């Protein structure tokens, strides 16, 4: 089930999945339904819902969710008459069994995510999704960490397993527009014409929209965004602002801009217990090239051990830590605290 309208950009909302990170995975069902209803009425193409770290991400390592994935998925599915219900799956966290449960709960699209050098672990999940008849896209996360040519090699693997779309995923919000252009163009040249390319950006260097536009102009046909930028770190490309920019550029999205503005201000911003914005901590994520969902974990560790969040993030970047290594955040904080005590 690939993108139905080949003449229109595919708008994938991630407010209820990436936005989970901003709320420590605590969306209640009433808010979930209200946001999904508003997005569906605004005519976005797809709405992603699951724990921030994907199916079965509710763990000690990543943070426990307010509900299980099936409850969230069913709540969104009940509100959608237009948008496709989408889930995220990271091999090693979620399983094929979890994907089948998500399908039973109402999901009809999945993004299978791996680190940018580990596409080979995605095969069974991609094949299972295709067997279920799901729209099957993939993420190559932390895409800033390898050159475009190496990223294209990984994308070809995902394509060979059955991926219908491969996303250039800037998990750290570290890429510049020219970096996005190079990666999308390289993938476009490497993949079959029918294999689509998507862009998933973060706003840590305030480039979420600029990078999305650069990716679209380079050949991407799917784009992720979230209401009020609700997502990990400084958030994703703000959906309402992105649609305004695309409207100005004459790019058809089919979305109701004012309805998205209203949903961002009336439904999403009031939920934020920590503002989703570019500040000294979230800016440090993009500058150091650190996985955006590390932010709140690093802030907790900084408070516990009396060190600067920026120092933790900088050291994580120096050590080239990636998603799944959240346990190392405390180790880094302890190392910094010990070094600080030694010179006191």
Curated annotation (Swiss-Prot):
Keyword Cell wall biogenesis/degradation applies: no
N-terminal signal peptide: none
GO molecular function, one term: 2-isopropylmalate synthase activity
Enzyme class, UniProt record, top EC level: lyase
Record GO biological process: catabolic process; L-leucine biosynthetic process
One family name in Pfam for this protein: DmpG_comm
Residue ranges annotated for the Pyruvate carboxyltransferase domain, each copy included: 9-261
Reaction catalyzed: (S)-4-hydroxy-2-oxopentanoate = acetaldehyde + pyruvate
Entry binding sites for Mn(2+): 18, 200, 202
Binding locations of substrate: 17-18, 171, 200, 291
EC number: 4.1.3.39
Domain of life: Bacteria
Keywords (A to Z) from UniProt: Aromatic hydrocarbons catabolism, Lyase, Manganese, Metal-binding
InterPro entries in the record: 2-IPM_HCS-like, 4OH_2_O-val_aldolase, Aldolase_TIM, DmpG_comm, DRE_TIM_HOA, PYR_CT
Annotated site residues (Transition state stabilizer) in this chain: 17
Keyword match Nucleotide-binding: no
Active site residues according to the UniProt entry: 21 (proton acceptor)
NCBIfam families documented for this protein: 4OH_2_O_val_ald (TIGR03217), PRK08195.1 (NF006049)
UniProt xrefs under HAMAP family: HOA (MF_01656)
Family: Belongs to the 4-hydroxy-2-oxovalerate aldolase family.
Name the UniProt record assigns to this protein: 4-hydroxy-2-oxovalerate aldolase
């Amino acid at each position: 089930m690939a993108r139905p309208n080949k003449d229109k950009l595919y708008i994938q909302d991630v407010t209820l999945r990436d936005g989970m990170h901003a709320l420590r995975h605590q969306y209640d069902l009433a808010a979930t339904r209200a946001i999904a209803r508003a997005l569906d009425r605004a005519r976005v193409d797809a709405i992603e819902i699951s724990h921030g770290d994907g199916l079965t991400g509710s763990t000690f390592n990543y943070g426990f969710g307010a509900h299980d994935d099936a409850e969230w998925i069913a709540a969104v599915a009940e509100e959608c008459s237009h948008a496709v219900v989408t889930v995220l799956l990271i091999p090693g966290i979620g399983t094929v069994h979890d994907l089948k449960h998500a399908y039973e709960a109402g999901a009809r699209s999945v993004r299978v995510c791996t680190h940018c050098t580990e596409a080979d672990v995605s095969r069974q999940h991609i094949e299972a999704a295709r067997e279920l008849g799901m729209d099957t896209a993939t993420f190559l996360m932390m895409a800033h960490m390898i050159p475009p040519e190496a990223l294209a090699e990984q994308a070809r693997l995902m394509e060979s397993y059955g991926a219908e779309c491969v996303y250039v995923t800037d998990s750290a919000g570290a890429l510049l527009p020219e970096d996005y252009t190079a990666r999308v163009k390289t993938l476009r040249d490497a993949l079959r014409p029918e294999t689509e390319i998507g862009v998933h950006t973060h706003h840590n260097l305030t480039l979420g929209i600029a990078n999305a536009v650069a990716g679209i102009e380079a050949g991407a046909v799917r784009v992720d965004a979230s209401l009020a930028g609700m997502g990990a770190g400084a958030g994703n490309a703000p959906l309402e602002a992105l649609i305004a920019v695309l409207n100005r550029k004459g790019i058809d999205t089919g979305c109701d801009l004012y309805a998205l503005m209203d949903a961002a201000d009336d439904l999403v911003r009031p939920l934020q217990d920590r503002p989703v914005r570019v500040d000294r901590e979230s800016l440090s994520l993009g500058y150091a090239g650190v996985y955006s969902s590390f932010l709140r974990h690093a802030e907790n560790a900084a408070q516990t051990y009396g060190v600067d969040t920026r120092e933790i993030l900088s050291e994580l970047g120096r050590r080239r830590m990636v998603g799944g290594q959240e346990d190392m955040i405390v180790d880094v904080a302890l190392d910094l605290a010990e070094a600080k005590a030694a010179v006191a």
